[in-house]
């Protein structure tokens, strides 16, 4: 039975991993960090935000790092997904420990945004680099291949027009995000019900919150919303969405749902991030839309959807974005973005895993 050491610390990575596993033979055994039986740790134990939060958990992260290095000895190959701050040092250590160990990196770090030197590091220590964006490959020498975007494996609903019956609210999956964004969304929902007559307001809740006390997690105002655990279906049925920054923004764009990105970080974290990452946009859909228009990703002039960040984010600005958005233009351009990303990646990655295992 082939054994694969997996390091998938992000919630979104585990959604992609689930689709990948459907395309692999049943007898493959997974060990490491992922969501599911047999995991050493769940990704929920890594949901920290901000520089100070990470510093406070360095002891735990170093413990996991050492355990993963030991686990690698049992594995036939290694699959690293996203989370470059953890996974790049892990790749280096595992390769130095066993130079013959095959390492695949799927969902590459955003070297086009910052720390471009990481591309050379990945080339040196990994055997296959699975790029999910067409323009990423140009930042690497020879080991990177464009494999398609995993969201196009997972999304089953695509709009044929911009009609919808609901307003969808997605305030993030981390408690720190929810605390900052959800109160604004509650007020927006109240105002739009009064002024626009919307009766159906849907709060999309991460599936791993099932069984938890949602009132304790979200606080006052949750009674204003219908609860949904199906983001894709909810976005498909929506007339408009209010979304905290993250993978959900790209999901909305691919489905074709008009939306506004809302994000507010701790002031110190935001200032530190700005020192290292100089981007006009933080939304994945806008970043990819720049590339689609032959502009530098994240630094172009073209914009698919509005972004309201830090002090620009308020109840008033959210409502203004809802009212002012050119929905017809957005929908037409979102179809171009869907075509740009073309196809999913699970089947391609599964075949590459089988190929690497045959080399061991």
UniProtKB/Swiss-Prot annotation:
UniProt keyword terms in alphabetical order: Glycosyltransferase, Lipid A biosynthesis, Lipid biosynthesis, Lipid metabolism, Transferase
EC class of the enzyme, as a word: transferase
GO molecular function, one term: phospholipid binding
Superkingdom, taxonomy of origin: Bacteria
GO-annotated cellular components: membrane
InterPro entries cross-referenced by the UniProt entry: Glyco_trans_19 (IPR003835)
Cited Pfam families: LpxB
Pathway(s) the chain acts in: Bacterial outer membrane biogenesis; LPS lipid A biosynthesis
Swiss-Prot/TrEMBL catalytic activity: a lipid X + a UDP-2-N,3-O-bis[(3R)-3-hydroxyacyl]-alpha-D-glucosamine = a lipid A disaccharide + UDP + H(+)
EC number: 2.4.1.182
GO biological process entries: lipid A biosynthetic process
UniProt function note: Condensation of UDP-2,3-diacylglucosamine and 2,3-diacylglucosamine-1-phosphate to form lipid A disaccharide, a precursor of lipid A, a phosphorylated glycolipid that anchors the lipopolysaccharide to the outer membrane of the cell.
HAMAP family named among the record's database cross-references: LpxB
Family note: Belongs to the LpxB family.
Name of the protein in its database record: Lipid-A-disaccharide synthase
Origin species: Helicobacter acinonychis (strain Sheeba)
